[in-house]
Regions:
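Glycine-rich ThDP/TPP pyrophosphate-binding loop and its adjacent helix/strand module
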Residues: 113-118, 128-143, 149-277
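Amphipathic alpha-helical binding modules
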Residues: 77-105
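Conserved acidic/glycine
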Residues: 106-115, 242-327
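Catalytic cores of large soluble enzymes that bind and process phosphate-bearing ligands
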Residues: 19, 126, 174-181, 200-208, ...
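Conserved phosphate/anionic-ligand binding catalytic regions in large, soluble enzymes, centered on
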Residues: 93-98, 124-136
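Aromatic-anchored, charged helix-turn/loop surface patch used as a conserved interaction hotspot
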Residues: 9-77
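Predominant activation on well-ordered alpha-helical scaffold segments within soluble catalytic domains
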Residues: 28, 100-103, 135, 183-190, ...
Length: 327
């Protein structure tokens, strides 16, 4: 699939999210109207209010929704009541306001549980050719999550350089090493102030990854998680990908952090730096351990030295900036 069709798919995901949001808003209106009916059964009133109070919480909305659905189904069944004969005569359908609204709730039962929306993509899409779409989705301030698998290169189309490609890395269209630094997508997203942002790396800190995913899912707004993802184009043994991820974080090549706007609302610093002080003595060894960098040193040793130094300086400057903002 080409990048333009991928961007179109992600825009459709947002449209789907907006459609679900509108349908759930209509469902909430029906529930409010239902529990406002004087003769509505107490069980439905109680379950309906519980669902309204928790409709934006994934787990709680599911539990409350099941109670409300059961109460509505029981409420429209008039077996054993004084209205049973007329109810049966009418095809087991009561046309009163309460029963009519209860049936509408039952018809929309698939909307009772809050839906989780995740958009997945690579760095070529998120940083580069589809960035306009990513930015548009984040700017809408909708409850949608984006997970970017950052390989720092266009992996699916043959290894072309992207705006995520760091200084000195060899890729198609950058055969002599990329001369500009990596785009800081996370910082750009944070500038909105209302976007949850996290930079993660699975094997380097699994707990931080899970915490970021959990916080992003719980946050009632847009979320962006950027995950370091080793790729065959890096020129490494992919069986050792998890070890390579840890090396990247340990030496400071990849910085772990979480930016949670909810903390700012509590008067706290929204940025949490999860990376430890980088072991910079291992930085150049990390670069030279990957073919995407090592091949540049073989072909253009003089150029490579300067670009590798700039790569390290860029990474350490980024860490220092995030450390300062987190203090």
């Amino acid at each position: 699939r080409n990048a333009s069709s991928c961007s179109c798919t992600r825009v459709k995901s947002l449209v789907s999210k907006l459609a679900i949001t509108q349908r759930r808003a209509k469902l909430a209106d029906n529930v409010r109207a239902l529990i406002a009916v004087d003769w509505c059964q107490p069980a439905i009133k109680e379950a309906g209010q519980e669902w309204l109070d928790n409709m934006d919480d994934g787990k709680k909305s599911k539990e409350a929704g099941q109670k409300l659905l059961a109460a509505c189904k029981d409420g429209i069944d008039l077996t054993g009541t004084e209205y049973e004969a007329k109810w049966i005569e009418n095809g087991k359908v009561c046309d009163c306001e309460a029963c009519t609204l209860a049936r509408k709730v039952i018809e929309d039962a698939d909307l009772l549980t809050k839906k989780s929306f995740w958009i997945f993509g690579g760095d070529g899409w998120a940083y580069d050719i589809g960035y306009g779409g990513v930015d548009h989705v984040l700017a809408q301030n909708q409850d949608v999550n984006i997970l970017v698998l950052d390989t720092e290169v266009y992996s699916n189309t043959g290894g072309q350089s992207s705006k995520s490609t760091p200084t000195g890395s060899i890729a198609k269209f950058a055969a002599a090493g990329k001369r500009t630094k990596k785009k800081d997508l996370g910082m750009m997203a944070m500038s909105y102030g209302y976007v949850y942002v996290a930079c993660v790396a699975m094997s380097a800190n699994p707990a931080q990854l899970l915490k970021a995913m959990t916080e992003a899912e719980a946050y009632h707004g847009p979320s962006l998680i950027i995950a370091y993802a080793p790729c065959i184009n890096h020129g490494i043994n992919m069986g050792l990908a998890q070890a390579e991820i840890k090396k990247a974080v340990d030496c400071g090549y990849w910085t772990l952090y979480r930016f949670n706007p909810e903390l700012a609302e509590q008067g706290k610093n929204p940025l949490t730096l999860d990376s430890k002080e980088p072991k910079i003595e291992g930085y150049q060894d990390f670069l030279k351990g990957e073919v995407r960098y090592a091949s540049l040193a073989k072909m253009f040793p003089d150029v490579a030295e300067g670009l590798f130094e700039k790569n390290e300086a860029d990474a350490l400057a980024k860490y220092a900036k995030y450390k300062s903002l987190a203090e």
